[in-house]
Amino acid sequence: MILRRLVLAGSLLLATAFTSAKKADSPIIMATRFDHEPINLFYFGDSDVVMLQDIKNGDVYVSRDAGVKWDMVNLDGLKGQALSLWSHPTDRTKAYILGKAGKHWVTNDQAVSWHEFSADVEFFQSLFPLVFHGKDSDRVLLQGHKCVGRDCKEVTYYTTDGFKTVDILIENARGCNWAVSTPIFGDGLNLSKEVNDRIFCIVPGLQSPWSDYNRLLYSDRFFKQDSGTEAPLDSGRAVSGVVRTASVKKYLLAAAKSARTSELALYVTDDGSQWHRAEFDGQRVEEDAYTVLESTNYSIQIDVVAETPSAPMGTLFTSNSNGTYFTRNIDHTNRNGLGFVDFEKIATIQGIILVNTVKNWEDVEMSALVEKKIISQISFDDGRTFQPLKAGKHDLHLHSVTHLSNSGRVFSSPAPGLVMGVGNTGGHLKDYYDGDLYVSDDAGITWRKALDEAHKYEFGDQGSVIVAVFDEGRTGKISYSLNHGKDWKEASLPDGIKIRARILTTMPDSTGLKFLLVGSSKRDSDVEHYVISISFTDMEERTCGKDDFETWPARLNEKNEPDCLMGHKQFYQRRKADVDCFIKKKFQEPVPQFEPCKCTVEDFECDFNFIRSTEGKSCVPARSLPVPEGACKKPNDKYMGSSGFRLIPGNACIREGGVELDKQIERVCTDTLTVPVSGEIVVQKTFFTADNYKGYFYLERKDSSKGDDETVIMITSELQIYITRDHGKNWKEIFPGETITRIVPHQYFDDVAYFLTNSGDGWYTLDRGENFRKFKAPIPPNQDKLPVLSFHPERRDWLIWTGAEECKTRGPQCHSVAYYSTNHGSEWHFLMQYVRRCEFIKREARGSSNNLVFCEQFENENPLNHHLQLLSTDDWFSEKKVHYNNILDFATMQEFIIVAVRGEKPEDSLSVGVSVDGETFAYADLPANVQIPVQRAYTVLESRTHAAFLHVTVNNVEDHEYGSIIKSNSNGTSYVLSLSAVNRNTYGYADFEKMQGMEGVAMANVVGNVADVEKGAAKKYRTMITHNDGAEWALLSPPSKDSEGRDYSCSTEGGKPTDKCALHLHSYTERADPRDTYSSPSAIGVMLGTGNVGEYLTLKSDADTFITRDGGITWQEVRKDRYQWEFGDSGSIIVIVPESRPTKTLLYSLDEGKSWKEFQFTEVEMLIRDISTVPSDTSRNFLLWGNEVGNGKKPGVAAVNIDFSNLKERHKQCVLNEEKPEADDYYLWEPMHPFQPNGCLFGHRAKYHRKRPDRDCFIGRELQHLDSIGDICECTRSDYECDYNYEPQIDGTCAPVPGLKPLDPKLICTEDPKAVEWYEPTGYRRIPLTKCEGGKQLHHIIPHACPNKEEEFLKKHPGLRGVGLFFVIMSPIGLAAAIGYYVYTRWDGKFGRIRLGDTGSGGFFASDSLLISIPVAIVAGVVAVATALPLLASSLWRSVRGYARVPGGSSSQRVYSSRAAFAAQRADYVGVVDDEDELLGAEDFDEEENDDRGQV
């Protein structure tokens, strides 16, 4: 949404007056000189009081005589402190001065007096500072930031009494709005007091600060008695990703964007309670690609970008009366890159719109280099039809909003029917300085030239006076006309002043005879600024009488007769053009007169649940219609229902004798919601002319995207590429006859994919395969198996292409060159040569430039020297910065950039370099207790919890690999051990997986016989689980009985697992398809896996299938044998199918796996190789991939669509009431954490929406599963982890690493200039993720003042002085000595340990003791995945978040890969974060230098 306020840069300081000679037949002109250009100039309504601001000096000025004399506003504390000046949009008496130092001022009497108020807030451009109530001018929101040093957070204040009192409304809100935000909001709806008090605020998500998780909350009590309720934007459900709200006329709009798409959803309300999603006739609405325009009282006008953003054009849409359905008015409207649209409604006249469109739009779509040819068009029927502007017989084209030359409206004013503009006649619009001034006095029907050259212009005295000033350079005169622009006179500026005009304006209603001209004049080397008043009040003109006026029809039809709109004709009493008089009705705007018309087709719109038909002549159902009570007992019954039309609300047409399109008609019951369903699962099998498939991936439609497609792209073993838009029911081959060698789905946007050839030609789709566009690369793709395309995380169309140069013959001259494009390949620009990989670094978590790019380049552009430099730039390498001279690789994540830096001695060692901002790097301190003789390989895991996670390889012997997971502090530089002996395979991937959708649950397979493995024995695995993000790990509890009701051969102790009897599951390194994860991001609490019960994990062939419904606490055996599984409809459907054996049937569950039903999907046995659904697991469709193997088999690979949407139990949508979440088909589920009986995890309790398993309904689009974060808990030892150089013990204790010292705690004083104190090390540090408050402060016990900060320290600790300070310091020392002696003499552990103790009483070591804490390490990563689709031998690789493959030594083909989104082929199977989690390593460096690197 484009919200803008037009100002001019500059300021004023000194005022000096000049006066021209007074003449009876010309205006009086007086000039006031200022040293700085004035800004924020405005009139108070219905007055001659004008204000402006000197922003440079921080002063404000006021004039009470329409700009003749100016006085500085002198208030205590205001001098030099004014930051901005604002007028109230609807109250003509109020204005506001926002100050620089927390003091602000308000006037309620047009600047006669001022009231000071205080609010500690700083103002940034990201928030609109003042938000006004539409009906009560005393109600205002004040938005900004509260800053302490560099740490700033959003804060919103509110007042209900005009700032007599001010209170904090909410903190950390990203924008707030009153529900009643305009004077006409809710008119005729009898709004309740609650809605009048209602405020909507955009706030961060409950578990994530990123904008994709923003929520829209509302409160009717100023967030005092509640924390807000989520607005039910979409069919009664809350929506995440709300990016902004805006008000226009009687509507409030909210825009939301889902993660991994640039497409927006717009939601509209006209009563503050009921929201509807706006539909745009199939048009995509992109982020920052639409503009809410000036609208009417009965519809919204929105311009939506249609095509190339680099040469933006739009489509103009107009809504129905409730803002739900938008119809297309005109295509190819002219826009600019700032979102301004060449669109204006003619003031005071209903239905007349003036737009500019692009004549050569087809050429512009083909190339951004083509200059747009712009033409002007006008509509007299509210945008239904458009026609050219005519000046005589010639087409006229006028400069509009995209070329603003004045403040206020471009063409019109409240002067009835008078319209002006700068432009030219001919085939299209020329440059502004090639234009002339044109005028129309019949609201745009006919035009004539007024003045040569471009001029600024303004209307006065209801159009009796027009003033114009030359706008192509300096001028010393003005021009004016007293007869609608037919004839013109000139008047000179006083004292020979020549200015460059900046603003020409008058009072807002254009009823006065005074004007203001702002301009600048250059004398010698000085620039002088003037505010010039122009007054026609003393001219010898009589006052107009009755005979001087005419009845003027505002609109004419094609027969030149008064036209009807909204049920009436509109007329004005307007002064005749050629009479010699002034109206002199100051502050009295012209009042329209209306004459009613009989109802016609134009007076009706589509009713609720209906949309315009394709031909636009009828209204057809948009969805199944609600059934009338008592009707539709049988499918063939009929009932009386809506015709599809309704009279537009507010339309005043006469019913009698007119058209009645809204009369009820007879409808058939098949249109209703109660159509009986077949109750059957529908199957559609498709065979392909290939023996197998090489890969598939989903282009998933997100919640904010339009349509209902479920798009899959599949590649066969014969290299044919097929697409389905309906999840496999119908397939179509794309690019037949083309040799596609690479398919590269966008790393960050699921709507986008690129299809490449070896020649450099390619195609891309921006809309999930609905359309394909061709592009040409600057050079062919590289031949080094480097990533060809790199993507920007936030700018969808920004690309980096790494291609091959001088490579026709493979020789030493062949090298890689990087180019970049900001318009998806329409234009390319050179970036750097001799590169290996280049990436955009911008992330939402860091404030870096959008242009920040990192590249790996061979030193001295010589790949033979084996040294890769890490370089960065934010100006496309006009300048560059060298971060490291010899690196192996780097990984970019949401919060960190981690670099594998090669060591000097030994040469094959690695160090870790870390940066949080992309500017400054520091080396990481790895824990000494992770015994790694030489750091040679590590895997970068997830970093969304304000900490980085690494898997560090401890044993690198082939087939015997394992390592440790370590976790960093908040800046990624200091690491502690989390879990040892985690299994790793030869390629560097670890058996580690986080449960999706829940905090704190992760599973890992560890090597259970480390000592034997070190001697050469085969690895034996055990599965461990954590429910508190690594604070404690335990074996999986086995089921009490198997699926056949029999006991297992081993036994547990009281139901708890033992070393001899636990459940073990096969993990990532054993999966044929890495996308087959245990859990789903939408099936909260549910996991499936295959494995066995016993001492260790056994062979896969011996595995059975298990399920948990409570986050891994308890498990149940589903079936003997191993099955493949998939979640559908957010877990309300679970489908399993046998793995590695032929079958005709599948099993499905509708109650989270409690019971299962068998379904036969084929007559011929099939061997199913995979089962899939959309990445979010929200569809009711599944795909089985396999081959027929039984009698009567057909050749070729088959894709079998299994559709549950017609199943009776899944045909009705579940009901969720956000205000009463347990009232209908859902309940609130609170995860249980077995080691924390109070339910706290990271200092809070969480509650999730889950469907009741016994309800027969479907969930539909993905829920915001997390309903709330309940109680904030007091800090306990579980909210802390071991500090650097402290390590967790096997028995749960925390001890110093022998022989090592903690980090110097005084470093904070030098690293943070704001630091006042440092604390003595305690061995503990607070977990970055915890929200706990109060309680145990284990990390801060004994404070000390930083050097030269003693005074601030004593102010912070006022009691620590003199004797008191002595005892505070000495008491802990004495107590520590006493405890030390006691422990040394009484405790067998002696020094070096802090015992965990039991939960009961335990003296010093009880669970609540301040002296001890359990080490907590967050394990919140995702499984590393090689997201590969081999299309042509090692060349087709898909990565949603980034992929890089670097073969290492011997035959290992060491992989350095993204682990953040194997979801490539399945997009988001693990719901991975936007980190590019990678495997970094160094093996056999000499060989690795000459090896190839894999495809991104």
Curated annotation (Swiss-Prot):
GO terms for biological process: Golgi to endosome transport; Golgi to vacuole transport; protein targeting to vacuole. Disulfide bonds: none annotated. Its main location: Golgi. It holds the Pfam family Sortilin-Vps10. Glycans are attached at N190, N297, N322, N971. Residues 1384-1409 are cytoplasmic. It comes from the Eukaryota. BNR repeats lie at residues 61-71, 377-387, 438-448, 480-489, 722-732, 819-829, 1106-1116, 1148-1157. This is Vacuolar protein sorting/targeting protein 10.
